[in-house]
Amino acid sequence: CILLQTRADDKYALAEEMNSFYKHQLNINTWGGPLNILECTPKGVHKAFALEYLLNVMNIDKQNLIAFGDEHNDQEMLSFAGKGYAMKNANPALLPFADEQLPLTNEEDGVAQFLQERFL
């Protein structure tokens, strides 16, 4: 994975342009809020890829996996998990990939609150 911080006014347009050029070799996603981060990974390598590997090694069914996300680079992970949750501050493009949207943001400790309410 390579992370690039860009000065581009529109990181989404830049990512789209780069994806069209490198579409057979790389996945290019955006994240970082105001930081304008582009995440470049080899085609087919993403968070769900890593989670699938770990689940296989640990002999855990993916239905027992919950995932939390807020940006484009979380799409595959939320789709892959048994339950995928988008944060309140999630990029709207991520919402179709989530089973549910949490009522709190990252900054409001939304994941910790969710885990405490559900499991403690």
Pin down the residues of each PLM region:
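Mg2+-dependent phosphoryl-transfer enzymes with acidic/Ser/Thr/Gly-rich catalytic loops
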Residues: T41-L120
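Conserved acidic, metal-coordinating active-site core of Asp-based
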Residues: C1-I66, H72-Q75
